[in-house]
């Protein structure tokens, strides 16, 4: 497991209360085994972090996308706070290397479990918020999510809706999605989905069917040169 100091460097933030950082990185499996002597895990912080992330992302969108109505803002926010996006942020921070977990959870693939990455990312957000203030966590989230906020088009945020709206505008049938393949086991699965519309077809992969469908739709939109 990597040192917490390395994570703080990546975040460009040093915790005043190191116990909050430890709590944010502690998997619930620790409390089920007395030998680890853990009395806290990340679950409560995850609950708070989810709310903090939604608030900050909402404020960023409100201030930076003045041309969009509330419906479009909601679509963008949904993309920015979804499991897939949060997991990408967590992966770029290398959070799997910092999670404190039992040996059993580790050998079961816990470090690569998207649920764990998502939960720890949200817990870390809450820990920073509690350790500092709303301005500090606002700046950190702004940096971590910058590449996702700056995509060029609304269709990038919601490719499935964009593809369906295009089909309807051309009087085509609605897109048909089909699961082609599932690889891996349980929480480490990779799904391959195809999307077909009026003779055009493209595939996409993801760690959930929903993510794979979005990626397939995005690829087909690119193929149709709509993005």
UniProtKB/Swiss-Prot annotation:
Top-level lineage group: Bacteria
Domain RNase III: 4-133
Cofactor: Mg(2+)
Transmembrane intervals: none
Reactions performed catalytically: Endonucleolytic cleavage to 5'-phosphomonoester
NCBIfam families linked: RNaseIII (TIGR02191)
Pfam family, one: Ribonucleas_3_3
Species annotation: Rickettsia bellii (strain OSU 85-389)
Gene Ontology cellular component list: cytoplasm
GO molecular function terms listed in the Swiss-Prot or TrEMBL record: double-stranded RNA binding; metal ion binding; ribonuclease III activity; rRNA binding
Subcellular location: Cytoplasm
Active-site residues, as the UniProt record annotates them: 50, 122
Principal EC category: hydrolase
Residues involved in Mg(2+) binding: 46, 119, 122
Domain DRBM intervals: 158-226
Main location as per UniProt: cytoplasm
Quaternary context: Homodimer.
Keywords, ordered alphabetically: Cytoplasm, Endonuclease, Hydrolase, Magnesium, Metal-binding, mRNA processing, Nuclease, RNA-binding, rRNA processing, rRNA-binding, tRNA processing
GO biological process terms on file: mRNA processing; regulation of gene expression; rRNA processing; tRNA processing
Listed name of the protein: Ribonuclease 3
Enzyme Commission number, as recorded: 3.1.26.3
PANTHER family associated with the record: RIBONUCLEASE 3, RIBONUCLEASE III
Family named by the database record: Belongs to the ribonuclease III family.
Function noted in UniProt: Digests double-stranded RNA. Involved in the processing of primary rRNA transcript to yield the immediate precursors to the large and small rRNAs (23S and 16S). Processes some mRNAs, and tRNAs when they are encoded in the rRNA operon. Processes pre-crRNA and tracrRNA of type II CRISPR loci if present in the organism.
PROSITE patterns in the record: DS_RBD, RNASE_3_1, RNASE_3_2
